Amino acid sequence: MANPKLVLAYSGGLDTSVAIKWLQERGYDVIACCLDLGEGKDLDFVKEKALKVGAMKSYVIDVKDEFANEYALIALQANALYEGKYPLVSALSRPLIAKKLVEIAELEGAVAVAHGCTGKGNDQVRFEVSIKALNPDLDVIAPVREWSWSREEEIEYAKKHGIPIPVDLDSPFSIDQNLWGRSNECGILEDPWAAPPEEAYELTASLENAPDVPDVIEIGFEQGVPVTLNGKAYPLAQLILELNALAGKHGVGRIDHVENRLVGIKSREVYECPGAITLIKAHKELEDLTLVREVAHFKPIIEQKIAEVIYNGLWFSPLKDALVAFLKETQKNVTGVVRVKLFKGHAIVEGRKSPFSLYDEKLATYTSEDEFDHQAAVGFISLYGLPTKVHSIVNKQNKASVPTGQ
């Protein structure tokens, strides 16, 4: 009788390499799955390593465009920053990884999927909730959570089974990266008082090493979608990667954040998101120009909720779908160009224009070109302040009629 098949989310690192052998010992034929999310990893090497360790098959799938257009774009249009800081780098990729795991499992006739998450992070929740939403019949196995080995025990197991030890194993940091940014934790970063060492960063220059001359760029949007950079059209994934290089050179997008994890603990994380931060700032400025006041004031409530829903692993939920439906409606007129200066860690918006601009210079100006009806303000103020005026009159009358105590 053939062994049951299992699809493993494979990164090429020690944990998921050891997981292949560990799962085989438990009777599974392991199919490795690695996605290209724009992190710049040597995926041919990863594919061959999975097969060398013992996977019966190894998938490598380029999902950069899908990730940019269907996941990162929603976060951008929501100006999504969890707790006002984190652009949801890892949180955005997990539902897409889960989706591909399920697709391959169904294609291969697998009975289970597995991931390499620990028992104290958010990702285990994101993966497992997403997988069960997409296919409730699949079993989900978390080898790292189950085996509870020390790092030394894991290395010993790897040596015993001839599993290659990564050359960067001595690095104290735990890193996750995709085209939307890079997250870094562990090592000295676990001390919230300790300054992140420069070796913790890869995508961004320090302020000291950033150029002394700014770059001024122009980002074009169509219905909330970034489509051009300095007048040149790019697919969204490529545009984000181009911005990572441009803004990263100037130190834009470094984030040092003590965040509240879904599992109940606080965690100190260091993020680099040069492209994401630059795009969010530009997009928000274009919205300020094109959204009516009521939508502009209400949308941040939806934005905060979308950020929480994504962070908490509820991508495939009815609530997320409903929130995104509102979000998409707001983007119909978010078309135009934003000019941004990149300099010493800052993305500074210096100009914005749109064919749907609600800014009317003849109404806003204080020059002789002014077309605003100043006399209309008299009646407006009277009606606007009427409830407050009536309240004040009634209170004064009641106070006057109340006898003072002896």
Swiss-Prot record:
Top-rank EC class of the record's enzyme: ligase
Subcellular compartments: Cytoplasm
Underlying gene: argG
Record PANTHER family: ARGININOSUCCINATE SYNTHASE
Organism the protein comes from: Geobacillus kaustophilus (strain HTA426)
GO MF terms held by the record: argininosuccinate synthase activity; ATP binding
Keywords associated with the record: Amino-acid biosynthesis, Arginine biosynthesis, ATP-binding, Cytoplasm, Ligase, Nucleotide-binding
Taxonomic placement: Bacteria, Bacillati, Bacillota, Bacilli, Bacillales
Gene Ontology biological-process annotations: argininosuccinate metabolic process; L-arginine biosynthetic process; urea cycle
Name of the protein: Argininosuccinate synthase
